[in-house]
């Protein structure tokens, strides 16, 4: 456990390093407001902090910088609740989910000046509504509406031909008896009830389940929307180290690791922070991510966040992510 003096010194060092980006020495700390310690005492405390793995000396510099462990202690125990003024909108206009997500990613990157990432709403294995539209003989359009309002269309080729009135009757029955159930629940019920259903309804139900499963499980290239990657070019931590910059851009290009990281983040409530390689999913020591879930009608459907250098103003990033998650939740929950 750190005593109050060591905590105050670590907090001051981290804040100074975040603000200036330069290793912090004992002489600089001795002039910091509220830190009434001599340079000799500060050096002793800094030596203790270094021994605990909370700060380190880069190269031959006389100053110190926080380690990932030091940032973690700072974030967990030393952040202030001071609210910053920021030019965030009061709302995001309700729109199609894809448009809301794109707007949110842009908002995150613009406010943070780092990288905004938003996981597109998960396709819950629940359909809110299914409709059938006759296109021609034995050629139907299946329209699937998810709980978050996303609409997917698929063309199917049934063995039998159906009139539009039969299709309307079938969709009305399906929506009345099966809407809100998961695909697995519908499949189980269908197996036990298929003999009781009229032939055309049973056949269309089976087709609907098959199409819904395909829609909800197929991989999508736009599972993560990313905005502001070029902002990292202006961050001295990256612009001076091409190796770090390359690793960061490889992460954004592949997306698979980002998806796993956001999925891990979605397991927690509130704002979550991964510093450096803490997540063990994205082992990039120079990056941190601040993330939060967003909801539709009270149900978590996705995760969003800001990715930037470990030397980021965490208080501000937490506010940006929290505000954006609320805006997205509100926009998606109030679509007409």
Curated annotation (Swiss-Prot):
Query: Which keywords does this Swiss-Prot/TrEMBL entry list?
Result: Repressor, Stress response, Transcription, Transcription regulation
Q: Does the keyword Ribonucleoprotein apply?
A: no
Q: Which residues cross the membrane?
A: none
Q: Tell me which SUPFAM superfamilies the record gives.
A: GAF domain-like, Winged helix' DNA-binding domain
Which GO molecular function annotations are given, in alphabetical order? Answer: DNA binding
Domain of life of the source: Bacteria
Gene3D superfamilies to which the protein is assigned, alphabetical: 3.30.450.40, Winged helix-like DNA-binding domain superfamily/Winged helix DNA-binding domain
Cited InterPro entries: GAF-like_dom_sf (IPR029016), HrcA (IPR002571), HrcA_C (IPR021153), WH-like_DNA-bd_sf (IPR036388), WH_DNA-bd_sf (IPR036390), WHTH_HrcA_DNA-bd (IPR005104)
Tell me, what is an example of a GO biological process annotation in this record? negative regulation of DNA-templated transcription
The similarity annotation says:
Belongs to the HrcA family.
Q: What does this protein do?
A: Negative regulator of class I heat shock genes (grpE-dnaK-dnaJ and groELS operons). Prevents heat-shock induction of these operons.
Name listed for the protein in its UniProt record: Heat-inducible transcription repressor HrcA
Q: What is the lineage of its organism?
A: Bacteria, Pseudomonadati, Pseudomonadota, Betaproteobacteria, Burkholderiales
User: Coding gene?
Assistant: hrcA
């Amino acid at each position: 456990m750190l005593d109050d003096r060591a905590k105050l010194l670590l907090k001051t060092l981290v804040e100074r390093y975040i603000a200036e980006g330069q290793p912090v020495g004992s002489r600089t700390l001795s002039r910091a407001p509220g830190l009434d310690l001599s340079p000799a005492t500060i050096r002793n405390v800094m030596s203790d902090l270094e021994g605990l793995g909370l700060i380190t000396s880069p190269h031959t510099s006389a100053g110190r910088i926080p380690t990932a462990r030091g940032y973690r202690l700072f974030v967990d125990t030393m952040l202030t609740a001071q609210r910053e003024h920021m030019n965030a909108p009061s709302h995001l206009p309700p729109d199609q989910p894809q448009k809301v997500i794109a707007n949110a990613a842009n908002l995150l990157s613009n406010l943070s000046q780092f990288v905004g990432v938003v996981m597109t709403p998960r396709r819950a294995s629940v359909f809110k509504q299914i409709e059938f539209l006759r296109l021609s003989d034995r050629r139907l359009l299946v329209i699937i509406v998810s709980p978050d309002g996303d609409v997917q269309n698929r063309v199917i080729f049934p063995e039998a031909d159906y009139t539009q009135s039969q299709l309307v009757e079938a969709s009305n029955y399906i929506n009345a008896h099966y809407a809100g159930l998961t695909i697995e629940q519908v499949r189980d019920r269908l197996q036990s009830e298929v003999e009781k259903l009229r032939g055309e309804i049973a056949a269309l139900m089976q087709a609907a389940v098959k199409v819904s499963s395909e829609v909800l499980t197929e991989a999508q290239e736009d599972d993560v929307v990313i905005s502001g990657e070029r902002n990292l070019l202006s961050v001295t931590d990256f612009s001076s180290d091409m190796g770090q910059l390359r690793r960061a851009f490889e992460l954004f290009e592949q997306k698979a690791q980002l998806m796993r990281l956001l999925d891990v983040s979605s397991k927690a409530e509130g704002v979550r922070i991964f510093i450096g390689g803490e997540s063990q999913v994205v082992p990039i020591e120079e990056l941190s991510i601040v993330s939060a879930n967003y909801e539709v009608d009270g149900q978590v459907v996705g995760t969003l966040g800001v990715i930037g250098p470990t030397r980021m103003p965490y208080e501000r990033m937490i506010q940006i992510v929290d505000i954006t998650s609320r805006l997205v939740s509100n926009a998606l929950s109030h679509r007409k």
